[in-house]
C-alpha cells in the first residue's frame, strides 16, 4: 500500500490525481497540504498548511507536488530528504541548477523522483510526433 501526501489542491489534483489515488486499491490518500485546509474535507483526510509537519505526521510514503512552479524544487527536495518518493508536476524546476539539486536529493535519499509528463501519451501528441517524423509539418523550433 502506497500512502500519498498531495501538496496543492488545484484543478490537476482535484480532477485527476486525487481521484486516481482513491481509485487505485494499492494507494491511499494520507493527507493534503494546502493553504485552505477545508479543501481536505471532501476527501475525509487531514490537511496541513505546513509541509514539514505533514511529512513528519502523515505517515506518507510518497508525495505528489502540484503547487506553483517556483515551489516544485524546494518542496520536492524537502520531501526527498524526509525519505519520501516524489512525483512532481511539470515543469520539474525553474532552471537546470534546481533540477540538478532535485536529482541529487533523490540520489542521496535513495528515493524515486518522477515528473508527471502524462500528456506525452495523448493520441494527438503521438500524431503530432508522427507528422514531425514524416516531415509533414516541418521542423519544430519552439514548444511549450
Q: What positions do the PLM features span?
A:
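Short beta-strand segments
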Residues: 6-8, 64, 144
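Alpha-helical structural signal in soluble globular domains
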Residues: 20-24, 43, 78-82, 101-109, ...
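Acidic-histidine catalytic/liganding microenvironments
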Residues: 24, 57-58, 122
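Short, well-ordered coil/turn segments that N-cap beta-strands
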Residues: 27, 61, 84, 111-112, ...
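Short, Asp-centered acidic motifs that coordinate Mg2+ and/or phosphate
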Residues: 31, 62, 142
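Beta-loop-alpha module in the N-terminal Rossmann-like domain of NAD(P)-dependent dehydrogenases
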Residues: 45-105
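A contiguous active-site-proximal alpha/beta segment in oxidoreductase catalytic domains
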Residues: 93-144
